[in-house]
UniProtKB/Swiss-Prot annotation:
NCBIfam families found in the cross-reference section: Mtu_PIN_fam
Locations listed in the record: Secreted
Name of the protein in question: Ribonuclease VapC37
Chief place of localization: secreted
EC number annotated for this UniProt entry: 3.1.-.-
Keywords assigned: Hydrolase, Magnesium, Metal-binding, Nuclease, Secreted, Toxin-antitoxin system
Biological processes per GO annotation: negative regulation of growth
Gene: vapC37
Organism: Mycobacterium tuberculosis (strain ATCC 25618 / H37Rv)
Function text: Probable toxic component of a type II toxin-antitoxin (TA) system. An RNase. Upon expression in M.smegmatis inhibits colony formation. The putative cognate antitoxin is VapB37.
InterPro entries per UniProt: Mtu_PIN (IPR006226), PIN-like_dom_sf (IPR029060), PIN_dom (IPR002716), VapC_family (IPR022907)
Lineage, uppermost ranks: Bacteria, Bacillati, Actinomycetota, Actinomycetes, Mycobacteriales
GO cellular component terms listed in the entry, alphabetical order: extracellular region
MF terms in GO: magnesium ion binding; RNA nuclease activity
Family: Belongs to the PINc/VapC protein family.
Name of the top EC class for this enzyme: hydrolase
Length: 144
């Protein structure tokens, strides 16, 4: 399973981004493929928050469109909603201890912990995922 980070979701809908085409191509292909695509609430909520933010994109999505997009992704046959297990708090603490910080890496550490719990990899443009011990991650162009 591959768990999708918010930046891939945002690039997939932002047609002005240089990462739009590889992100959309990977996401569409993954959602129509046989392998599971993991979605977690933190990246999904970040997508809704940022995709609808005036001034961030040339044409922010209307709230309804962003919510519908999330629903469409989750309705795909290969989509799986990934939730923390009972081991999550311990794994999350280990991830934060390993990188020696919290702050801006807390959400990344949460996603990294989910990946470890579910034996998944992360798809993201954020190289910070390379800092977490035992976490596999790829950028969409490398997966095409």
């Amino acid at each position: 399973m591959k768990i999708v980070d918010a930046n891939v979701l945002l690039y997939a809908v932002n047609t002005t981004s240089e990462h739009h085409k590889p992100s959309l191509r990977w996401l569409d292909g993954a959602l129509s493929g046989a392998d599971r695509v993991g979605f977690a609430w933190v990246p999904l909520l970040a997508f809704v928050r940022l995709a609808t933010k005036v001034g961030l994109f040339p044409r922010p999505l209307p709230r309804e469109a962003a919510i519908t997009q999330v629903a469409d992704w989750l309705a795909a046959p290969s989509a799986v909603l990934v939730n923390p297990t009972v081991r999550h708090a311990d794994i999350l603490a280990r991830m934060l201890t390993y990188v020696g910080t919290g702050a801006n890496l807390v959400n990344d550490a949460h996603l990294a912990a989910l990946a470890v719990e579910h034996r998944a990899s992360i798809v993201s443009y954020d190289s910070d995922f390379g800092r977490f011990e035992g976490v596999r991650w790829d950028q969409p162009p490398a997966l095409l």
